[in-house]
Amino acid sequence: MPHAGISFHARRHRGRLCASSGLAMLALSCVAAPAVAQSQRDQSASEAPAAVQPTPSPVLPVQSANATPGPYQTYDALAMRGWERPLPKSGDTLLGDKLGVRDALADAGIGFIGFASNAIQYNFLQNDGGYKGRQLYNAQKLTRNVSNAAIFATYDLGRIGITNGQFIFSALYTSNSFNRVDGPNATRIGRLAYYQSLFNKKVEFKIGYFDNGFEFLGTQTGGSLAGGTLGPQASVPNEVGLSYSGFSTPTANIRINFKNHVYTKLGIQRSLPPGGATPEVAANSSGLRFHIPGTGLLTIGEVGWDQPAKPGTLATWVRAGGIYNSTNFNRFQGGQSKDNWATYIAVDHQLFQIDDSKANRGLYVGGTVNYAPPQQNFISQYYEGRIYGVGLVKSRPFDLASIVANANIYSKQGLVARTAAGQGNFKQTYSVIASYAYRLTPGLYFQPGIGAVVHPIYSPRFDTAVNGYLTLTFFI
């Protein structure tokens, strides 16, 4: 019987839209994005897919556009570079500048931030018509869909004469209570990379071991992981082999920044195996293996316009791209494809501002479309609309409220191949999720959410689920 599930993960990435403060790297879990159904990411074309249920992911703070005074400016100058949206600033951590830890490390050119997140979800209706078999989708019963802990460290290579260069390291532990759908438990190297900017940041490149989930696409609602994996949850990029948070591969990226906030970015990575994280971890538990049999080269290209919020200037981020993977994937109707590919487009726009001193505060709308060929990708189309507010409550400038609606369209060939004889199926899954990321104190975020998921699994035909979501995230 087919199984289903969703997941977190981003899946994640240079702080502009919403002038967002750091994404909580929770995305580490990702991400991109509630992100996509992990189960889908972890299965090849010949395997049963998971249900496409969205799940909010670790919360991440929306930072102020204002510079943080005092020693924090020194700490933040050592923050990890090269993401589409940055990690939280050091002032938005539980440790802050206490105990002299950051001072001592900064004196040596070292920056660091720690992060941990736990997310659960549950279908309040419990309306599966008396079904007594194994769990098929997230929230069918109380599900801990992600628990992550990560440490990020950087070293300023200017200390040894490499101006504007940075060495980046991260390690991650990830686990969940539903491995069959949400992916394997793992402890892995997350990043081991060299970043360099040239010509006053007109050119940026990064090479080493890292994931592209937070380097492209921009799958965090409001540009912030803190509020973020509630939005763009499309799994299409991951289905075709793009690496995502917690599952890095050898990668090289280059970004060129033109005038008027226009940019283009190109990435080359070793593909994840067909099936995603499960075969990746089975063959590469440490995360340091350069090549895995059966994987090819994946390239991704993106062009965009990323206008940051300024007093009187509304934020707008438009991006579009394509992915090509030389890896062979099983086709649903037999045989193998010689490659795989996907396309995407996404737009986010600030409708109005509510605080001239913090221009990122205000109301935003956005949308995302993903497509991949249905011959070998079970989710072939993904559509999303979102509306979200940053600091809408006067006394709550760091909070993020969001409503995200999406539709996942299944491959017709895939449904034929994966639906058990005598059972019906659904051709798509729809969901609407509302959530509020509440900053309890600097470095600590609490994110409750509620959502309706129509067709939580493609087969058998279960009724609409009404899920509660709860995520607690903290930064050290």
Task: Report residues per predicted region.
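Long, well-ordered hydrophobic secondary-structure segments characteristic of membrane-embedded
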Residues: 83, 90-193
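Outer-membrane beta-barrel architecture
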Residues: 100-102, 152-154, 193-195, 253-255, ...
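Transmembrane beta-strands of outer-membrane beta-barrel proteins
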Residues: 110-118, 165-169, 203-207, 260-266, ...
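Outer membrane beta-barrel
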Residues: 142-274, 377-417
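Outer membrane beta-barrel transmembrane domains
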Residues: 275-293, 302-304, 321-337, 341, ...
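Outer-membrane beta-barrel "beta-signal"
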Residues: 464-476
